Design a protein with these regions (language model features):
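Glycine- and acidic-residue-enriched helix-capping/strand-helix junction motifs
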Residues: 12-27
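Short beta-strand elements in bilobed, periplasmic/extracellular small-molecule ligand-binding domains
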Residues: 29, 33-43
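A generic structural signal for short coil/turn motifs at secondary-structure boundaries
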Residues: 14-18, 41-42, 94-96
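Active-site histidine-acidic residue metal-binding/catalytic motifs
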Residues: 2-15
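Hydrophobic/aromatic beta-strand patches that form the interior of the parallel beta-sheet core
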Residues: 6-8, 41-43, 121-123
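Caspase-like (clan CD) cysteine peptidase catalytic core
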Residues: 2, 46-73, 77-134
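A broad detector of the eukaryotic-type serine/threonine protein kinase catalytic domain
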Residues: 12-13, 38, 56, 90
Length: 135
């Protein structure tokens, strides 16, 4: 196998609404990619610590593969122009706590930028709401 995929589906959130489809979507994508010859790291309902560990482990393994694919389904948000993926334990009391307790997608993008000449695919099935925007 020369293709690696990280699949995360977050549906069961502690402080925001539960989502019906992310678990199903992640399960389907993981199954299809496995059939296509990807080595699949597949996770459901990750808190921030487990999400950061999963992404770090994926990036550390990526050097051994010619193709990497990252798929996330769940809540997302954009605050101050920064895109975040929402872990199941995200803190929403104020903007600063939210930004610290969500996964900054730039961490992933910076990580894959070191793998030049490889194919890296990122699929995000998430909204980009800003719960702190002023209308």
């Amino acid at each position: 196998m020369d293709r690696l995929a990280l699949i995360i589906g977050n549906s069961k959130y502690q402080r925001v609404g539960t989502l019906k489809n992310p678990q199903n979507d992640a399960t389907d994508i993981a199954s299809i990619l496995s059939t296509l010859g990807f080595e699949v790291d597949y996770y459901l309902d990750l808190n921030i610590s487990k999400m950061e560990t999963a992404v770090r482990d994926y990036l550390l393994k990526l050097d051994e593969f010619s193709t990497g694919l990252f798929f996330f389904a769940g809540h997302g948000m954009q605050i101050d122009g920064i895109n975040f993926l929402v872990p199941t334990d995200c803190e929403l009391k104020d903007k600063a706590k939210t930004m610290l307790s969500c996964f900054n997608i730039n961490k992933y993008l910076e990580g894959i930028s070191h793998y030049k000449g490889k194919t890296n695919i990122c699929i995000l099935d998430a909204c980009r709401d800003n719960p702190y925007s002023v209308s």
